């Protein structure tokens, strides 16, 4: 019976992650050459300027992908608010909301395996599909 519960838990985890993946939308981002350009762009947008106008005025580019070109490295205003931190918080949030709920259902060897699978699924989700092996594996 414990095997059925663990299988159900994994299926529920996969379904929830599938629903979340369906809701992810790609939005355009701005990349600037330096912090001055980033500050200029943010001030322009705050004042009500459109993305293309502010990007042109401040020497920035509007991109549709997740990565800025090498010559336009400034994606965020603060250096500590970069993509690695966002990925880390995404993974922590996913594990907390999805995997911890599974952990509360049942304990045992199967559940430990399921938790590893759930953690890996969260890591893949937050890293755009990159495979990251679990520490417990």
UniProtKB/Swiss-Prot annotation:
GO molecular function: toxin activity
Function: Thionins are small plant proteins which are toxic to animal cells. They seem to exert their toxic effect at the level of the cell membrane. Their precise function is not known.
Entry's Gene Ontology cellular component terms: extracellular region
Protein name as it appears in the record: Leaf-specific thionin
Keywords: Disulfide bond, Plant defense, Secreted, Signal, Toxin
Pfam families per record: Thionin
Transmembrane regions: none
Main location: secreted
Keyword Disulfide bond attached: yes
Domain of life, per lineage: Eukaryota
SUPFAM superfamilies: Crambin-like
Protein's GO biological process: defense response
InterPro entries: Thionin, Thionin-like_sf
Positions of the pro-segment in this chain: 75-137
Entry-linked PANTHER family: THIONIN-2.1-RELATED
First and last residue of the signal peptide: 1-28
